[in-house]
UniProtKB/Swiss-Prot annotation:
Additional observations: Reaction proceeds by a ping-pong mechanism involving intermediate methylation of a conserved cysteine residue.
Protein name: Probable dual-specificity RNA methyltransferase RlmN
Annotated active site: 95, 339
Binding site for S-adenosyl-L-methionine: 164-165, 196, 219-221, 296
Binding-site residues for [4Fe-4S] cluster, renumbered to this chain: 117, 121, 124
Family, per entry: Belongs to the radical SAM superfamily. RlmN family.
The encoding gene: rlmN
GO molecular function, one term: tRNA binding
Record organism: Leptospira biflexa serovar Patoc (strain Patoc 1 / ATCC 23582 / Paris)
Primary residence: cytoplasm
Disulfide bridges in this chain: 110-339
Length: 353
């Protein structure tokens, strides 16, 4: 979408003021447009009835109000999770997932930040795709707008854990996160928004320096500095030692816990030794939480751990650290909507819309 003709979605209030002034409109119109986009969730400019018809016509003539195009809508028979495929250009697809956990009414949308991914994490299907670029801020936010409209409900939490590496699209991701947080827009609390990374230390350090208020998660997945590269190629450029240093800096300077995500893979990163190494990292970082996730994908030749293997690993981990440990469930596995499965070809369920 060419910005020679400005796109209203994805803009901050200040940016909308600049657009209004450039069109000869009163500056206060920006606040009306802003709340109309993000709070009222209007799908067309004609719905902005707080604006005069003359103003609406001027906006339609000189600005754009696009939507990402809905493709597939798969519904899990197991837990009600829904995975949406959206088209953002010719041969460019992204996915977002609606996760109704049922835990105290928590409703999460997992959104994408890139078309494909710049990294190649061996357990993640997105890494198999050709990288086709960063998403613009409006395309990130429109995933939330579209999913909420399609499910007829509002999210309580947003996680940037879909397709792509958020730290490689830092500006657009953080801009979207701040709009999601704004009380005049989506109105989500900062700690209901989680930004994730596979371990891009430059992005983590920038996040710290900017004193960003959001939750932050690191996809760790191996506690051994040398072996981690065999699971995640990001470790070659951003070694585990520097990653842990950044995590320590995060907890010290921002004075809040960081989350480590750990995909459990038998014969790769499980067993007592790896549990003890992971616990040592947790102790050194001090303020952290650990989410352990059984491997979901099977294209790697690796297998999903058994329940007993998971229990054994978590038991050894708990014996060596006081950090909170969550055995994260994997909603949407039957529609390839769980962690690491985005971009895998799903089987349309009988409840597909």
């Amino acid at each position: 979408m060419k910005e020679e003709i400005p796109v209203l979605k994805g803009k901050t209030k200040k940016e909308l003021e600049e657009i209004c002034v450039s069109l000869g409109l009163e500056k206060y119109r920006a606040a009306q447009i802003y709340t109309g986009i993000y709070k009222s969730r209007y799908t067309t400019i004609d719905q902005f009835t707080t604006l005069s018809k003359e103003v609406r016509e001027k906006l339609k003539e000189h600005t754009q109000y696009p939507e990402i195009e809905i493709g597939r809508d798969l519904v899990s028979k197991e837990d009600g999770t829904r995975k949406f495929t959206f088209y953002v250009g010719e041969n460019k697809e992204i996915e977002a997932v609606w996760i109704p956990s049922g835990d105290g009414g928590r409703k999460t949308i997992c959104i994408s930040s890139q078309i494909g991914c710049t990294l190649n994490c061996k357990f993640c299907a997105t890494g198999l795709l050709e990288y086709k670029g960063n998403l613009q801020t409006w395309q990130i936010l429109d995933q939330v707008l579209q999913v909420e409209r399609l499910v007829g409900d509002r999210a309580t939490n947003i996680v940037f854990m879909g397709m792509g590496e958020p730290m490689h699209n830092y500006f657009s991701v953080m801009k979207a996160a701040h709009i999601l947080r704004d009380k005049d827009a989506f109105g989500l609390g900062a700690l209901r928004i989680t930004i994730s990374t596979a371990g891009v230390t430059t992005g983590i350090n920038r996040f710290i320096e900017n004193k960003e208020p959001f939750n932050f998660a690191i996809s760790l997945n191996h506690p051994n500095p040398n072996a981690r590269s065999s699971v995640m190629d990001v470790n070659d450029k951003h070694p585990l030692e520097k990653l842990i240093d950044s995590a320590k800096r995060f907890t010290k300077e921002l004075d809040r816990a960081i989350t480590f995500e750990y995909v459990m893979i038998p014969d790769v990163n499980m067993g007592r030794d790896n549990a003890e190494r992971l616990a040592k990292i947790a102790r050194s970082v001090n303020k952290c939480k650990i989410n352990v996730i059984p491997l979901n994908t099977d294209f790697t030749g690796w297998r999903r751990p058994t329940d007993d293997e998971v229990k054994d690993f978590v038991m050894h981990l708990k014996a060596k650290t006081t950090a909170p440990i969550l055995n994260r469930r994997s909603p949407g596995r039957d529609i390839n909507g769980a962690c690491g499965m985005l971009a895998l070809k799903g089987i349309r369920s009988e409840t597909t819309k």
